[in-house]
């Protein structure tokens, strides 16, 4: 039924003899897989989380803007982002333009070619992702002083400083700062970034989450439990990169 709806929508668009038709939204390329121009609107997941917390956006395919942000995040992490990442990988080689939507009301657009050039350069040189800080019930006070954070926010618990799935990456085009999810770099150049041994084991996924945990003058830290690699593979968290798909 959904497939028939998509086919019907595509035929309706193709039957138009004049004018410009803009198809936009999550999964728009499903509706019009062979478009004249493909603009991919991208946003870092930390910004998505901030908009969840401000009750500004819903998860994919539902109207749950007023739901608890923690539940929206779980749905995003385990459902929305898994689906959208797989679809993104099939589109990256087809992008004409990339849209930076991280600052509300101030979008920036760059050609896919120049964005790819920036990612390629990053894969071969030192770089860091954009860190973000988050409070927690057991958090401490040390990072406030060391990182010059907001003194009014109680208990900073986390500094996420190398979590490509959720951090962002700044690319500089002249005087313009262009922000994209740093996971785009992992998807685009996984072998160059990770090396063959790591890529062979984990695919185009960054296998480690680096973060600083502050418990100074705070509470006890939670117990961390990490799965075996075999279990991760069973959950299909790893998959071929778009470039390897092109090679095959």
Give the ranges of each region predicted by the language model.
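Single conserved hydrophobic/aromatic residue that forms the stacking wall/gate
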Residues: 2-8, 237-247
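Small-molecule kinase domains that catalyze NTP-dependent phosphoryl transfer to phosphate-bearing small molecules
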Residues: 28-29, 54-116
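Solvent-exposed alpha-helices and their adjacent loops that cap or buttress functional pockets
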Residues: 31-32, 91, 215-216
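Glycine-rich loops and low-complexity Gly/Arg-rich segments
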Residues: 45-50, 62-67, 122-126, 235-236
